[in-house]
Each structure stands twice: as structure tokens, then as C-alpha cells.
């Protein structure tokens, strides 16, 4: 992933402005209050230690800084809920087995989405980790959600 990112940064001519770093979400290599904000897209559900990762990202925010998390969620509206469930749990893993050498990746995604705390439950975890003014915005009838919180 980082190798692909480095190639993109080089191609865009951003090597003087962008630094890619590999690290542990629960032990970030940055000083307290370093950032005005952060964004994480479809990655927080993969944290081994969700609360530790959120707390650590909170630590790196400046006072008043905003954390933004985009994650998959489970739609609740008929018939999208049923269509999404069939696609995510049956069709995608089945096609993944046929076309990929890593069939486990296609079953991991729906499993990780099912296990991830969403909605009010995730916002309560954010609050426990120090965020305030937590909000959630559902996208595409609930297939994904954006969570925000302020330090």
C-alpha cells in the first residue's frame, strides 16, 4: 500500500509536501496537538484496539481539531437492506473466490462490517475516547456513515 502511495506522490510531484508513514494506530509517532484534523476512510473498523486508536488520534489533535471517520454501515431501508445483505454476504464472496487468489479477503470485509459498532454505539465510543459534539451522517441510505468529533 505504501509503495503504491509513494508512486502516486512522486507522479504528482508532491514529495516535498507529503510524507507517508507506517505506524500503529494505538501508538502514533506524533506530538500531542500536532494536527488540525484527520480523516480515516474505511480503516477504523480494522483497528486491533479501537478505543486505543481513537484515543491516540484524539491526542494528536489540536484543541478544537476535528476527527472524521468514514466507515461502512448496514442499511436499514427496505429493499436496500436485503439487496445489500445478499450482495455483501453471498455475491461478493462468491465472485471473489472465482477471480481472486485471496478469497478470505472477500469474506473478511462483510465480517468486519458486521462486527463494527455503528451509529450511536460508535459515537458513544468516540465520546469515551474524549471527543465532543459527535455526529453521524448516513450516506447512500446507510451503506456508509461519516462520524465526526471535536477535541
Put a short name on every predicted segment.
Residues 125-151:
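C-terminal lobe and adjacent flexible extensions of AdoMet/dcAdoMet transferase-like proteins
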Residues 67-68, 133:
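A short hydrophobic/small-residue beta-strand
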Residues 27-32, 48:
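Short conserved loop adjoining the S-adenosyl-L-methionine
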Amino acid at each position: 500500500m505504501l509503495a503504491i502511495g509513494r508512486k502516486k506522490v512522486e507522479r504528482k510531484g508532491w514529495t516535498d509536501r507529503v510524507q507517508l508513514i507506517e505506524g500503529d494506530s494505538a501508538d502514533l509517532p506524533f506530538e500531542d496537538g500536532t494536527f488540525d484534523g484527520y480523516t480515516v476512510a474505511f480503516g477504523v473498523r480494522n483497528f486491533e484496539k479501537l478505543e486505543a486508536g481513537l484515543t491516540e488520534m484524539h491526542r494528536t489533535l489540536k484543541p478544537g481539531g476535528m476527527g472524521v471517520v468514514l466507515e461502512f454501515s448496514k442499511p436499514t431501508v427496505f429493499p436496500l437492506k436485503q439487496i445489500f445483505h445478499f450482495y455483501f454476504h453471498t455475491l461478493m464472496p462468491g465472485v471473489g473466490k472465482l477471480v481472486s487468489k485471496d478469497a478470505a479477503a472477500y469474506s473478511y470485509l462483510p465480517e468486519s462490517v458486521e462486527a463494527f459498532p455503528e451509529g450511536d454505539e460508535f459515537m458513544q465510543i468516540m465520546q469515551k475516547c474524549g471527543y465532543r459534539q459527535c455526529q453521524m451522517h448516513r450516506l447512500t441510505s446507510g451503506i456508509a456513515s461519516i462520524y465526526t468529533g471535536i477535541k
